[in-house]
Design a protein with these regions (language model features):
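Sec-dependent N-terminal signal peptides of Gram-positive bacterial secreted proteins and lipoproteins
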Residues: 1-17
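Extracytoplasmic soluble-region selector
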Residues: 4, 18-120
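Ser/Thr-centric signal marking residues that sit
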Residues: 7, 92, 225
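Sterically constrained small-residue positions within well-ordered secondary structures
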Residues: 8, 47-49, 59, 85, ...
Length: 474
């Protein structure tokens, strides 16, 4: 009987402020002269940015006395009227002690709690550049008198700009090789590892290697490329190539300013796949997206989408980096568009493509879950020995993403034109922002100076860039 009596004295009441215990005797008309609802707070959980204010409202508290207290005034302060001011990142609880008159001579107190999280908006700036395509003359441009190689000059016009980004992605079009006798350009490229040194020095920290040239130097090219980037894993993440089967399904993540970003890179084809192990390169198996025919591929469409979904479940933001499309055309194929839509629907938050050696437009895709996904179909080259005007007009994909209160969104997506400057004699190469380029510099571009084409001017390049049909992020 004692247990039953104690249970009867307290009745749980659910309110917005949580469950409180109300004295059952207060409902007794012989004892209570005041019939009222239980006090409650309008909010029991809040997330605020530092500096923001919010006023908690007491409900059912007319005629009651109230005192307010913050559990940690270094995180939030609270005024006598329940006005919260967020001070600094952290978690604490604001308590309102409400004293309610029950009878003329009796009161009851309630402690109403609101959990408060103060969180600064996290932000990450991401950029990507196109193909580092090392033709014979590009290789030769870095050779020094002592036989070593240095390619810092290529990045002289962009390195400072690159370092303003938290994530800087580049497409290493051609595999590394460690035998100088095999340093070569088209058609079976072999590139000095000195390029990697220059990339790191320029601020590049994510490198894609799944391209149509990945198998140009066969197994040794795979080994040297993977080993080089593995030895620099604290400075850059390499995507796309694998020495062993157990890393083939690996998804790479990078945490930047509290935002976890996933990266997935693949190519739709190889120039030649004879003798390759199925796990060496991320190659999409489906010929639906392979405009060049039935080349070897081990990454099925279903596995690709599963990989994107898995990345989405573990990351705040997913970037997919396909090597796809038709060379030397500014227009995405229907196959690219279909694949882009499917990748967006699977969870890709941004799609950044390479391979065509010319820029294709940035378009905004509406994903099936309502997200808006920027798709840069092609960034064009970054450095090459192609003298044609369109192949020297290039782009930087630029994204600013933010995370707050568990939600990651794209604040801005831009496409910035750049230009590959080939010296008149084609002995040196440097890439510039088009906004930093002048017609005086253009006059010394090999396309104009050596070949007399006169096709590269600042206005001409800008007009071409604006003509490809880029959409604007709003």
């Amino acid at each position: 009987m004692l247990v039953l009596l104690i249970t009867a004295l307290f009745i749980p009441v659910s309110t917005q402020a949580g469950t409180v215990l109300q004295n059952a005797a207060s409902n007794n008309a012989t004892e209570s002269n005041i019939d009222r609802a239980v006090p409650a707070l309008n909010e029991t959980k809040l997330t605020l940015m530092p500096g923001k204010k919010y006023t908690l409202v007491l409900e059912n508290a007319d005629g009651c006395s109230v005192s307010w207290k913050s559990g940690n005034t270094d995180i939030v302060t609270v005024s006598k009227k329940g006005r919260i001011t967020a001070v600094a990142d952290g978690k604490t609880t604001v308590v309102a002690t409400v004293t309610v008159p029950v009878t003329e001579n009796k009161t009851k107190s309630y402690k109403l709690k609101c959990k408060v999280v103060v969180e600064t908006v996290k932000e990450a700036r991401i950029a990507a550049i196109g193909d580092l395509l090392f033709h014979d003359r590009v290789i030769a441009s870095g050779k020094k008198s002592d036989g070593t190689y240095n390619y810092d000059a290529i990045f002289k016009g962009t390195a400072d700009y690159f370092k303003t980004f938290d994530v800087m992605i580049a497409n290493q079009e051609t595999p590394f090789i460690d035998d100088p006798a095999k340093y070569k350009g088209y058609p079976s490229f072999g590139t000095p590892t000195a390029l990697g040194d220059a990339m790191i020095k320029a601020g590049i920290n994510v490198v894609t290697t799944a391209t149509n040239h990945s198998w140009d130097q066969r197994t040794r090219g795979i080994e040297v490329t993977v080993d080089y980037w593995k030895s620099h894993k604290d400075e850059a993440i390499m995507l796309g190539m694998h020495k062993t089967e157990n890393t083939f399904q690996t998804i790479h993540y990078k945490k930047v300013n509290g935002i976890r970003i996933a990266f997935i890179n693949f190519t739709t084809f190889l120039n030649d796949s004879s003798g390759i192990q199925p796990y060496y390169v991320n190659i999409l198996k489906s010929n639906t997206y392979n405009e060049y025919g039935g080349y070897y591929g081990s990454l099925t469409e279903e596995k690709l989408f599963e990989k994107i979904k898995k990345a989405k479940s573990k990351a705040d933001f997913v970037i997919v980096l396909p090597h796809w499309g038709i060379e030397y055309t500014h227009t995405p194929t229907s196959a690219q568009k279909k694949l882009a839509q499917k990748m967006a629907d699977a969870g890709a938050d941004a799609i950044i493509g390479c391979h065509p050696h010319v820029v294709m437009p940035m378009k905004i895709i509406d994903a099936s879950d309502g997200r808006r996904v920027p798709c840069y179909y092609s960034l064009g080259n970054f450095v090459s020995n192609m003298s044609q005007a369109a192949r020297n007009l290039e782009g930087i994909a630029e994204l600013t993403i933010t995370k707050w209160n568990g939600e990651t969104t794209i604040k801005n997506a831009e496409f910035t034109p750049i230009i590959n400057h080939l010296s008149g004699s084609e002995t040196s190469y440097c890439v510039y922002l088009l906004s930093d380029y002048t017609d005086e510099m253009a006059a010394r571009h090999s396309s104009n100076y050596l070949y007399g084409k006169g096709t590269i001017t600042v206005k001409g390049m800008l007009d071409l860039f604006n003509s490809i049909g880029n959409e604007t992020w709003k």
